[in-house]
């Protein structure tokens, strides 16, 4: 009995129960690795019937403004520190980005033609018949240049970048990140003001985290998927 009591006293006072796990330290001499996470926002619903320059007309409809406010609130609620906000030069993208910028006023909105809507090569014959070889080549060159500019490893710290652009642009970027034939970009759709998230690791590898996530938009406010709304639209 005396031996048992002595043993228990040792365990409680300074033995097994009192022992702290050893701190786990990263190996010395190993450089930290950072990631870049890119949040691709498709613009909101817009006036497709308007005629004229896309940088002047074809602005957001009331539905599109409501969608923009919803995605802005989604972004504002994320537990990350956003580091940049870029948008296409087209009116509908600039207006959507402006709403996002109001929700995230610490960011400086940058406008770039690299994110403009365009039509790159696709397997769809019905789409290709209306395009010229020069136009297709220009679109592909633009999107490849945009991908090379924005989808690069982070330096110094984790980066969280928002790109407000267009459906064709976003889908092309997804095919590039997945390493599949970029002509497959018409094989899926992304809703207006949906979120597509792609991460770039320290070695230049890509991981697609989300495609066309529209969970922040009620079903009756969804658009841009090529189908009718499931319920009458009521502005929030």
What residue ranges belong to the model's regions?
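Bacterial N-terminal signal peptides
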Residues: 5-15
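Active-site-proximal alpha-helix that buttresses catalytic centers in soluble enzyme cores
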Residues: 20-112, 131-136, 140-145, 226, ...
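Active-site metal-binding loops of divalent metal-dependent hydrolases
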Residues: 44, 167, 214
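Glycine-rich phosphate-binding loop signature in dinucleotide/nucleotide-binding domains
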Residues: 78-80, 152-159
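Active-site signature of alpha/beta-hydrolase-fold catalytic machinery across serine-
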Residues: 99, 172, 176
